[in-house]
């Protein structure tokens, strides 16, 4: 969405994408989760409101149960990525060297994929790594709303029952995920922009 908005700034697509992205950033995940449960599950009865199914037992049911929690967790991240990508791409596409590439006869698609996205990818990897960390924290609340037996509900149950080894184990697992994601993001940034290695 951010790429589409950046290609034609100030058009109706850009304004629509910006409005949706602003809403996605502004709405808290737990509130969006409750709206999804009330409207899509209880009112329309399209998807299940609570629980989770194993993918090995029933792939279709597993997808149906994971859809609403996935939307609730990912909405903020998708909106933030769209906003940041739009802003970064607008800056790159309005730069002098992009005008030179246009003058040389390169198509907009080629400029976008070979030059534009490459230049904004460092920002993109950094934002995504930060959003993964935020999503880990959001799972605690989202799992409570959808009654999903996951790491978030496990750490809450462990804290309530004062089961400190469980809490330490979950925190340790989350720390490993955060470190791994940040390391991968740093390696990708260094691969895209060799100046970062120096």
Where are these regions (language model features)?
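Juxtamembrane non-transmembrane "cap" segments at the membrane-aqueous interface
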Residues: 35-42
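Short clusters of hydrophobic/aromatic residues that line enzyme substrate/ligand-binding pockets
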Residues: 47, 52
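N-terminal signal-anchor/first transmembrane alpha helix
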Residues: 12-26
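Alpha-helical transmembrane segments of integral membrane proteins
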Residues: 1-13, 29, 42, 46, ...
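Transmembrane alpha-helices and their membrane-interface boundaries in multi-pass membrane transporters
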Residues: 27-35
